[in-house]
C-alpha cells in the first residue's frame, strides 16, 4: 500500500490522480490534500478519502472548510506554508506535486527535503529552480517521476537504454487551437477561444500556455533537468492527434516512442505505480480508428514563446525563472482581458531583456528573482 499526499487536489491533475486512486483502493491511500480554489470540492474529497491533514488557500477558507466537515475532520492548514506542511507530513510515501505555477516550488522542495518521492506535474518547479531541485533529489535520494505526458513518454522510452546512446529527445505538441491561424488574426484571439484545446482537458493557465506554445517551451526546460539533456539535443515536433506523446532517437537511428489516448490518467498511473503498472481507466488505443498520424515543424515566428524558452534554457542561470514568472503574470492579464493574446510573449520577452542574470545559491534567491520578474511583467500589463 502506497500512501499519497496530493498538492493541488481540486485541479485537473489532482482530480485525475484521485480517479486513479479510486480504482485501486488496495494499492493507494491518501494522507494529505492541498487545494487553492474549491473548498466545497475539498470537503467532498475529505469525506471520501479521509486524509489526516489538508491545506487551503487562506485562513478564511480554513474556517469555511471546518464548518463544512465539522470538528472531527483532519488537521487544517493554509497558504503556501500549509501546502508545504502537507507535503512533508509523516505517513506519506509519495507527494503528487500538481499546484499550478511557481507556487508549487516551495512545497515540492520541502517534500524532497523530507525524503518523499515526487510525482511531478508542476513543471515550474524545475523551470524556476532546476539546478537546486536536481541537487536536492540526489542529496536526499528520492525518486522524481514525471507526470507530464511528454516526459512520462520519454521516461518510458529511455527504460533499459544508456544515456550515452541517446541522439536526442523529441517532445510532441498538439499545436493548440491556433495551429493554422494566420499571424494577423492571433492579435484578435479572446480568452474563451484560447481555452478550447483541441485534444486535452486541462486547467485554464496550462490551456493558455498550450495555445501560445509556452507550455511546450516550459517542457523543454523541464526535460533538460529531468533527463540531463542540453538544448541542442531537445527537439519539438507538432503532432495534432496527440497520440504519440514523445520520442527518443538513438545514435543507431532507431526511435522509441510511447503512444496512448490523450488522457492524463495514464502518465499519472505510471508515476504512482512505477516500476510496476496499474490500470488507469483510459480508453484503449485503436490505431485503425485513428488512421493517420501527422507531424509538422513548430512555427516559432507565429508562436515566439517556444523560441523564448529555448533562449532562456541556453542562457541558463535565472533566465528560465524570469521566463516563467513573466508568463504567469501575462497569462493572468490575458485571462482578465487586460492584454491581447500576442502580448503574452511580448511581455515575457521584454521582461527577459530587462533581466541581469544571477547564479542563485539557495531557494530564497530564486524566489527573489521570481518576485522581481512578476513586478516587472505586471508593470508592462498596465
Swiss-Prot record:
What are the binding positions for 1-deoxy-D-xylulose 5-phosphate in this chain? 123, 149-150, 174, 197, 210, 215-216, 219
Which first-to-last residue range defines the signal peptide?
none
Per the record, the pathway is: Isoprenoid biosynthesis; isopentenyl diphosphate biosynthesis via DXP pathway; isopentenyl diphosphate from 1-deoxy-D-xylulose 5-phosphate: step 1/6
Positions contributing to NADPH binding: 10-13, 36, 122, 124, 203
Question: What is the enzyme's main class?
Answer: oxidoreductase
Q: Which InterPro entries does the UniProt entry name for this protein? A: DXP_reductoisomerase (IPR003821), DXP_reductoisomerase_C (IPR013644), DXP_reductoisomerase_N (IPR013512), DXPR_C (IPR026877), DXPR_C_sf (IPR036169), NAD(P)-bd_dom_sf (IPR036291)
Report keywords, A-Z: Isoprene biosynthesis, Manganese, Metal-binding, NADP, Oxidoreductase
Q: What is its EC number?
A: 1.1.1.267
Tell me which Pfam families the record gives: DXP_redisom_C (PF08436), DXP_reductoisom (PF02670), DXPR_C (PF13288)
Catalysed transformations (reactions): 2-C-methyl-D-erythritol 4-phosphate + NADP(+) = 1-deoxy-D-xylulose 5-phosphate + NADPH + H(+)
Report the cofactors: Mg(2+); Mn(2+)
Q: Which cysteines are joined by disulfide bonds?
A: none
Please, one GO biological process term?
isopentenyl diphosphate biosynthetic process, methylerythritol 4-phosphate pathway involved in terpenoid biosynthetic process
Presence of the UniProt keyword NADP in the record: yes
Residues annotated as binding Mn(2+) are 148, 150, 219
Q: Record keywords: Cell cycle included?
A: no
Q: Name one GO molecular function term.
A: 1-deoxy-D-xylulose-5-phosphate reductoisomerase activity
Q: What does this protein do?
A: Catalyzes the NADPH-dependent rearrangement and reduction of 1-deoxy-D-xylulose-5-phosphate (DXP) to 2-C-methyl-D-erythritol 4-phosphate (MEP).
Q: Which family does it belong to?
A: Belongs to the DXR family.
Protein's UniProt name: 1-deoxy-D-xylulose 5-phosphate reductoisomerase
The taxonomy runs: Bacteria, Pseudomonadati, Chlorobiota, Chlorobiia, Chlorobiales
Amino acid at each position: 500500500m502506497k500512501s499519497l499526499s496530493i498538492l493541488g487536489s481540486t485541479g485537473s491533475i489532482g482530480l485525475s490522480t484521485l480517479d486513479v486512486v479510486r480504482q485501486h483502493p488496495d494499492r493507494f491511500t491518501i494522507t494529505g490534500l492541498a487545494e487553492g480554489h474549491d473548498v466545497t470540492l475539498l470537503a467532498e474529497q475529505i469525506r471520501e478519502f479521509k486524509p489526516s491533514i489538508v491545506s487551503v488557500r487562506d485562513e478564511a477558507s480554513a474556517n469555511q472548510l471546518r464548518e463544512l466537515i465539522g470538528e472531527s475532520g483532519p488537521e487544517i492548514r493554509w497558504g503556501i506554508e500549509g501546502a508545504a506542511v502537507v507535503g512533508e507530513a509523516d505517513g506519506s510515501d509519495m507527494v503528487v506535486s500538481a499546484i499550478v505555477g511557481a507556487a508549487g516550488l516551495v512545497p515540492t522542495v520541502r517534500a524532497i527535503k523530507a525524503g518523499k518521492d515526487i510525482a511531478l506535474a508542476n513543471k515550474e518547479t524545475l523551470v524556476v529552480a532546476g539546478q537546486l531541485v536536481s541537487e536536492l533529489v540526489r542529496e536526499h535520494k528520492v525518486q522524481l517521476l514525471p507526470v507530464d505526458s511528454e516526459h512520462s513518454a520519454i521516461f518510458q522510452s529511455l527504460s533499459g537504454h544508456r544515456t550515452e546512446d541517446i541522439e536526442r529527445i523529441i517532445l510532441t505538441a498538439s499545436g493548440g487551437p491556433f495551429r493554422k491561424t494566420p499571424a494577423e488574426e492571433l492579435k484578435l484571439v479572446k480568452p474563451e477561444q484560447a481555452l478550447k484545446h483541441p485534444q486535452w482537458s486541462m486547467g485554464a493557465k496550462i490551456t493558455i500556455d498550450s495555445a501560445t506554445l509556452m507550455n511546450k517551451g516550459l517542457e523543454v526546460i523541464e526535460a533538460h533537468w529531468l533527463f540531463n539533456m542540453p538544448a541542442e539535443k531537445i527537439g519539438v515536433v507538432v503532432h495534432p492527434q496527440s497520440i504519440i506523446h514523445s520520442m527518443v532517437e538513438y545514435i543507431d537511428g532507431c526511435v522509441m516512442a510511447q503512444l496512448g489516448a490523450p488522457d492524463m490518467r495514464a502518465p499519472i498511473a505510471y508515476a504512482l505505480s512505477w516500476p510496476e503498472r496499474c490500470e488507469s481507466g483510459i480508453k484503449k488505443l485503436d490505431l485503425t480508428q485513428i488512421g493517420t498520424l501527422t507531424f509538422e515543424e513548430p512555427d516559432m515566428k507565429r508562436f515566439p514563446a517556444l523560441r523564448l524558452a529555448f533562449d532562456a534554457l541556453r542562457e541558463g542561470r535565472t533566465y528560465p525563472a524570469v521566463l516563467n514568472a513573466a508568463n504567469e503574470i501575462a497569462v493572468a492579464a490575458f485571462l482578465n482581458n487586460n492584454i491581447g493574446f500576442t502580448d503574452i510573449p511580448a511581455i515575457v520577452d521584454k521582461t527577459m531583456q530587462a533581466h541581469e542574470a544571477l547564479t542563485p545559491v539557495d531557494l530564497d534567491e530564486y524566489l527573489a528573482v521570481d518576485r522581481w520578474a512578476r513586478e516587472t511583467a505586471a508593470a508592462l500589463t498596465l
